[in-house]
């Protein structure tokens, strides 16, 4: 099997040489209901101190992106994670996720669609292979846009599901910081 190229993360900023590729991936990998307006996303790269956008690079080639938030002292939240279509199924996503988790050194939570059909089950399986567990906590994602609908999703974490009180605080922090919603 061919060895994977060297992976690095590069903070995305308005002057990043691969910002155009990252923006195109953001807009095509995630439907409009699963992402914020692109202009706002670009602005957040320099104005939101808890928001981090990273280009995934393989030997100086743009391979994907990870956006994440520092929610609490104990938890980070991966909002978006995507690999460019030409590099999918090559193992780069798993290497990138493992590298992110080892460099971040903390608890991470993310949202996934309920396991009602094949694609969400495959996505959940991918995260499980990289140390995440599907939490039983009922969860709804606030809309990214005014007037949008709340989506029934599931949370996964690289730790065991917290006790109910801690879970509620985590969801409240996620909703307030990421979506601007007061529960």
Predicted regions and their residues:
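Short, well-ordered beta-strand micro-motif
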Residues: 55-57, 155-159
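Active-site rim helix/loop that mediates acceptor-substrate recognition in acyltransferases
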Residues: 29-58, 62
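Short amphipathic alpha-helix that is part of the acyltransferase structural core
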Residues: 1-40, 153-155, 166-183
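Conserved beta-strand in the GNAT
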Residues: 55, 61-70, 75-82
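Conserved GNAT acetyl-CoA-binding A-motif
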Residues: 104-119
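Short hydrophobic/aromatic beta-strand or adjacent loop that forms the aromatic wall/cage
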Residues: 51, 150-155
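Conserved catalytic-core motifs of GNAT/GCN5-like acyltransferases
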Residues: 111, 124, 128-148
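Conserved acetyl-CoA-binding loop-helix of GNAT-fold acetyltransferases
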Residues: 83, 89-103
């Amino acid at each position: 099997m061919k060895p994977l190229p060297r992976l690095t993360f590069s903070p995305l900023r308005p002057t990043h040489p691969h910002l155009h590729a990252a923006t195109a991936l953001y807009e095509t990998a995630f439907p409009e209901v699963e992402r914020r307006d692109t202009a706002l996303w670009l602005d957040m790269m320099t104005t939101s101190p808890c928001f981090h956008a990273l280009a995934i690079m393989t030997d100086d080639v743009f391979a994907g992106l990870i956006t994440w938030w520092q929610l609490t002292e104990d938890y980070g939240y991966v909002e978006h994670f995507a690999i460019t279509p030409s590099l999918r199924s090559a193992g780069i996503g798993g290497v990138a996720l493992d590298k992110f988790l080892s460099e971040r050194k903390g608890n991470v939570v993310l949202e996934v669609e309920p396991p009602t059909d094949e694609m969400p089950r495959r996505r959940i399986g991918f995260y499980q292979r990289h140390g995440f567990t599907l939490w039983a906590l009922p969860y709804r994602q606030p809309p990214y846009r005014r007037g949008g609908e709340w989506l029934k999703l599931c949370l996964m974490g690289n730790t065991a599901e917290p006790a109910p009180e801690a879970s509620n605080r985590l969801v409240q922090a996620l909703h307030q910081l990421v979506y601007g919603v007061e529960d």
